[in-house]
A protein has these predicted regions:
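A compositionally biased, intrinsically disordered/low-complexity signal enriched
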Residues: 164, 174-175, 200
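The feature captures the hydrophobic core positions of alpha-helical coiled-coils
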Residues: 168, 172-175, 190-193
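Short intrinsically disordered terminal tails
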Residues: 141-148, 202-218
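Short amphipathic alpha-helical heptad-repeat segments
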Residues: 154-169
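Short, charge-rich amphipathic interface segments used for partner binding and complex assembly
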Residues: 182-206
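Serine/threonine-rich, low-complexity intrinsically disordered segments
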Residues: 129-132, 141, 181
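Residues lining hydrophobic/aromatic ligand-binding pockets adjacent to catalytic sites
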Residues: 1-135
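Charged, low-complexity interaction regions
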Residues: 148-153, 173-186, 209
Length: 218
């Protein structure tokens, strides 16, 4: 599992940590490992920072999420990132309830991989799960859907699984053409991925419908 936290809430060397800030945790005197691939680009960070107080917080944060998706996350393989960072805590500066790109990273992994990436703090050697701004995940999902071909899906995770299946199918085609051998294992895995995509899509639609009903009751 990957968790996220801030330097004030996680002061321990008991667990593997990675700074994902642009200055590698310098402001917190952090001496541990870093994962610069997830750091925000200075160009859009400056625009966002300079706009604080000049435009609405909602508009400004949406700009940040949009650029972070365009310039950082869309270039990365979520499965590779998860493998490399598994069993670690990703660190940045802001308190858990404040807008921060670590919350965008958590939302991205949860949306595409169907995993849980909790925000945590360390208290008397106990890991305590805390809250984070939920609107960040909603904004990211909206932006991702607006920037890719959903191919009839409503769930980004379902689309991700379907396209992974297509990649395996294409790989089998290429290898069979090159070697003359059968790669039924790849084709079977591709079939499983497409079936999983259909199940994820169905569950996503049900949850959306239930969410709408719950809001109407309120």
């Amino acid at each position: 599992m990957i968790c996220t936290s801030n330097h004030n809430d996680w002061k321990s060397d008991m667990y593997r940590t990675y700074s994902i800030s642009g200055n590698r945790g310098k402001d917190a005197n952090y001496k541990g490992e870093c994962y610069p691939a997830l750091a925000p680009k200075l160009s859009f960070w400056k625009v966002w920072h300079n706009n604080i107080g000049k435009i609405s917080e909602e508009e400004n944060n949406k700009y940040y999420v949009q650029e972070y998706w365009n310039q950082v996350l869309s270039k990365l393989d979520p499965e590779k990132v998860y493998r490399e960072l598994d069993y670690s805590v990703l660190l940045c500066y802001e308190p858990n309830t404040v807008f921060c790109h670590r919350h965008i990273v958590a939302a991205w992994l949860e949306i595409l991989l169907g995993v849980k990436v909790p925000e945590v703090r360390l208290e008397d050697y106990r890991i305590i799960e805390t809250s984070r701004p939920e609107y960040i995940k909603e904004i990211l999902e909206e932006i991702m859907k607006a920037n890719i071909n959903m191919r009839g899906f409503t769930s980004l995770r379902a689309l991700y699984l379907f396209e992974k299946g297509e990649e395996l199918e294409a790989k089998a085609d290429k290898l069979e053409e090159e070697t003359g051998k059968c790669y039924d294992g790849y084709r079977q895995s591709a079939c499983y991925l497409r079936c999983e995509a259909d199940m994820v899509e169905e569950e996503y639609r049900k949850n959306k419908q239930q969410h709408v009903l719950n809001r109407k009751k309120k």
